[in-house]
């Protein structure tokens, strides 16, 4: 293509994404748009087409990003090229949403006509506004009996401050309003700005590992043109590669000769390691590099940590392979080997949040058929010592001795919880139980309230979301952002079995709730650990102080069975001999902790 052709093509490109809260009908709308633009034959169409992982279909959530190029003949008779970039809606994947929004010029905001605006909708709208996107509100599911589009339209104007007078009323399921949405995209979303003659700048917004072609980077070209055979450089890592293929997704991968300004597609360059294509990095030409990378990218830091151990310790290497393969597609996952006396060899893994952690665990169990034990999730603590040094602790067993600790700081989050009026009391109670500090309360309309709390991340990691959902009958929605570290009275609690510490059961807890947690765990273990030949004390300790104790009684043989009547001194002798033996056993005996005891303690809730 020459310069004029490229410029004409560029004026016809529209890049947009769809943002919505979970379950407001985003993936269905994407399906309808694909149908309307004839991207697929009827035979190839299936529900949630862009959600390619089984797990995504099953949970009905979008985890990885997907991008599609669609051709649309608008009412003005012109052919337009639309790029739809699908985004995940869950709070753990906020960074992935921000990347895919940065690759667009416009966003369709889908709001459920019955439920109205939810917490995550707001969070994503703010991300879109930060990226200066043109936002087109769409009120979806208007065919529901409980739909109230006018109220929702008012809510969009009041809560977000968008003009919703031209909001499209649609039903993705019934296919109503799809054409209006496409027309609005063509009219209102600006064409990409950029110059095809400038040095190349492409933004990576996702990457995928293909066993035959290496890493395939999903890219949006901002300036310049990239062709097969070009030598390109990744600006963050400085690695250089030769491009082997470029192309676009028409959901299927379709090869092209070149990608130019405004194109959204893929690039393969026999890259072996996904760490070389960081999400959010800028690709440029090695010979004629861009002056600076595109703004807005950062390396993701995991927030939540836990240990993953294979139940069958022989499968340690399989687990490593599984984690390495998942890491190829998931730049936010981190792991390092770790050993535990109780659980053997395993890995300490870092995740973006709880959903991310659950998904990784589930994918390992599903795709790689490895049964896992997971230790309790923990966050990163900052520990300041009395000698003026400070250290970072992400694993309770690395916590130093309480005598030398000056103070401990933990990460806090600002949580915005949207909830119907009737449940405000229940939500406040949960937040206070989780050491939350009340900040603010705002009424969205007559029926719904937003509560803002500051809560320690470690409390949210534990079963906050489950409690919130079960106490509000599933109506509450919740979004959080980190606000930094604050000092807290935190202590490390160890569990001793027969005076020996079980490292996998150590955890960090707030001093006020230490006694209760210790007591519950000790009782739980007493039920689950089988009786031994000698008595086994179970103790919960903080430093050298025992806060809770329980004893598993010994099993004993009746040594007096042979003595019918007879002298007391004879019985005494046999009993003393037995006692002596038990004592000796106790000093050398070790106690096996069964698998289910670990599981039970780790799954235990605060109740």
UniProtKB/Swiss-Prot annotation:
The compartments listed are:
Cell membrane
Q: Which GO terms describe its biological process?
A: positive regulation of translation
| Sites where the protein binds GTP | 23-28, 140-143
**GO CC list:** plasma membrane
Catalyzed chemical reaction(s): GTP + H2O = GDP + phosphate + H(+)
One GO MF annotation is: ribosome binding
Q: What is any Pfam family matched here? A: EFG_C
EC no. given is 3.6.5.n1
Q: Give the matching HAMAP family.
A: LepA
Listed name of the protein: Elongation factor 4
What organism is the protein native to? Bacillus thuringiensis (strain Al Hakam)
